[in-house]
Each structure stands twice: as structure tokens, then as C-alpha cells.
Design a protein with these regions (language model features):
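Terminal, membrane-proximal amphipathic helices
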Residues: 1-81, 107-230
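Conserved phosphate/anionic-ligand binding catalytic regions in large, soluble enzymes, centered on
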Residues: 79-100, 197-203
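Active-site metal-coordination segments of metallo-dependent hydrolases
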Residues: 99, 103, 119-120
Length: 230
């Protein structure tokens, strides 16, 4: 008989309260949506980033996407902004600050990309597609196990099926499980920041590389609204 421990991310997300890990996955997703997309304190919301960059790029969406990706890579290399968000708000996650920084930046970069391309990032299905983009190759497995087809991209798999709110919540939580599962490896890569000079450079390089990959994937997953679904 399979237990919750043996189940995959989607199956575990659909289970009732699973204890600490289940709660951690839920809290991580909530923070990514609430802070990464909607903003908090010094961390500007994705829609504001998109509007300002589009204005700076004089309406050129492609140039705006380049600026968004560049700016977030630079922030990823510097880090440190999480300390300004407030310990009480972030404490329940019990995650290393640099790991949370990375995921918040990746979430906002993806959401801003979607906004520039014409999507309503307040819609639940779009927000789920943003989270799925963070999961990378793992998202295909999540969608497959949910009975959705990702041939046209994660966005089309989620949007075209018009999933009800409970199903979207399960998908979001499954992404949370996958991201938490990566934290051990990601934290190891970033522990180099504790070592002066060389270690810090290695940690920054890892974040920049990963943000660059996610930025390219976001541009692919969120084509211009005028061409979406064709």
C-alpha cells in the first residue's frame, strides 16, 4: 500500500493535510503568488515592473522582455532584498533567504513577462501557469499526471482546460512540492556565498544562469496574446 511519502508531487498535493511538508508547500506557493506577483513593501509587483519597462522601451515588447530579464539577473547576482520584506511575513517558510530570493525573482520575472505579452496575471489559471514555468521540466510530469496535455505549452494546457479553482490549487501545491524538493541541491550550490570572494561569485553565477534559463522559458510559454492558441 502506497503512503503519502511514496506518492508523487501531484498525488501528495491532492491529499488532505500531510503535516509539515504539505504546509510548507502551501506556504511557499502563497508567498510566491502574494509577493512574487503582487509585490510587498520594497518588492515591486510584476504589473508595475511590466508597465515601467514597457514605457522605458517605448512600447517595444521584445525590448521590454530583454530589460526585465537583464534586471532580474542583476538582482539575482546581488541578492539581499528579502531582509527588507519583514521577518514575520517570511518566517513561517523556514527557507534559506537566498533560496527564497531566487524563487521570488523568478516568479516576478515570469509574471512580468506574461504581463508584457498581454496576459491578465490576476487570473488564477495564468498564475498557475507562471508557477508551472518555475518547475521547468518537472511541470510536464505534473501536467501529465493531472491528465493535461502540454504539447502547446504549460499555459495552453492549463488555460484551455478551464480548470476549476480546487484543481488549480492542487496544481499549485504540486509545484510547491517540486520546488521544495530542489532546495537541498539549490542550497548546496548557494552555500558558496558564505565563502568570501570566490564562493560569493559562484553563488551569484548559479543564480544568474538559472534566472536566464527561466526567463527564456517564460518568453516561450507566454507568446503574445494575439498569437496564443494558434
Amino acid at each position: 500500500m502506497r503512503t503519502a511519502k511514496d506518492a508523487g508531487a501531484l498525488e501528495r498535493a491532492a491529499l488532505p493535510a500531510e503535516g509539515g511538508l504539505s504546509g510548507a508547500a502551501t506556504r511557499l506557493v502563497e508567498r510566491l503568488l502574494d509577493v512574487g506577483i503582487d509585490g510587498k513593501g520594497p518588492f515591486d509587483p510584476a504589473h508595475e515592473i511590466a508597465a515601467n519597462v514597457l514605457k522605458h522601451a517605448r512600447g517595444d515588447a521584445d525590448e521590454a522582455l530583454r530589460i526585465i530579464a537583464r534586471d532580474h539577473r542583476q538582482l539575482g547576482a546581488v541578492g539581499g532584498f528579502v531582509t527588507g520584506l519583514g521577518g514575520f511575513f517570511l518566517m513561517p517558510l523556514s527557507l534559506p533567504a537566498n533560496v527564497l530570493e531566487f524563487y521570488l525573482l523568478a516568479t516576478r520575472m515570469t509574471a512580468a513577462t506574461a504581463k508584457v505579452r498581454g496576459y491578465d496575471i490576476d487570473q488564477p489559471e495564468i498564475r498557475s501557469a507562471i508557477l508551472l514555468t518555475l518547475a521547468g521540466a518537472d511541470s510536464e510530469d505534473i501536467l501529465k499526471k493531472a491528465g493535461l496535455h502540454a504539447a502547446g505549452g504549460k499555459l495552453s494546457a492549463v488555460a484551455f482546460d478551464r480548470l476549476p479553482a480546487p484543481a488549480l490549487m492542487v496544481l499549485n501545491k504540486a509545484v510547491g512540492f517540486r520546488l521544495l524538493g530542489r532546495i537541498g541541491q539549490g542550497t548546496f550550490a548557494r552555500l558558496g556565498r558564505l565563502v568570501p570572494f570566490v564562493g560569493g561569485l559562484v553563488g551569484a553565477a548559479v543564480d544568474v544562469y538559472m534566472l536566464n534559463r527561466i526567463g527564456k522559458q517564460a518568453a516561450k510559454e507566454f507568446p503574445p496574446v494575439a498569437t496564443f492558441g494558434r
